[in-house]
């Protein structure tokens, strides 16, 4: 049967390529920011939840040459695209795909790090494309269930990183704290200095610490800010 869904545009980075296939989710600035910001240099094992095309897993594999990475997704089209992207990357031997629901999957290990670009639309009109709907709406994975599952999957000193729109991110942090998490780091992302915070990069830990709060402005003076370039230059071709 012919696939009637449109293909997602491919995207090339400095050390790997993302072929979107029919995954329904193109490469986003959100994902790139999270993959560049999360501090996973001490992690030996990492789980990418809802990997989609595999962007976060690939960025983490590039950044940490010793980390073994599992990437899980429930969507067949996403898994097909991620498999192609993992196989064509320089780090295929350290990348494994898991098919299934993260809430019920029988994981055989705990993880030093978890990264996730979670669904965030809790209500309103659903995305027209079913793959995009699953990726963007909390239809199949509530934030509470996600946080509880991540808490159980982390190793004793593990950390988890997420990216969410500002309003949803504040609620996510509050919910996390009621479930026993502690905020370890937060980056407030602004498109420009004159625009409000649009995204939150969130670092959570099972142990209390002084949270590092920082800001990132993406564009300044009709170009990218020095901070944005410094954060993403290892990945973007034209940085």
Segments from the language model and where they lie:
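SAM-dependent Rossmann-like transferase core, predominantly class I methyltransferases
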Residues: 3-45, 51-53, 58-62, 200-203, ...
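Conserved beta-strand segments of alpha/beta enzyme cores
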Residues: 17, 68, 94-96, 182-185
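Conserved Class I SAM-dependent methyltransferase catalytic core
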Residues: 18-19, 23, 27, 141-197, ...
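Mobile active-site "lid"/loop adjacent to the S-adenosyl-L-methionine
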Residues: 118-145, 149
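SAM/dcSAM-binding transferase cores
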Residues: 195-239
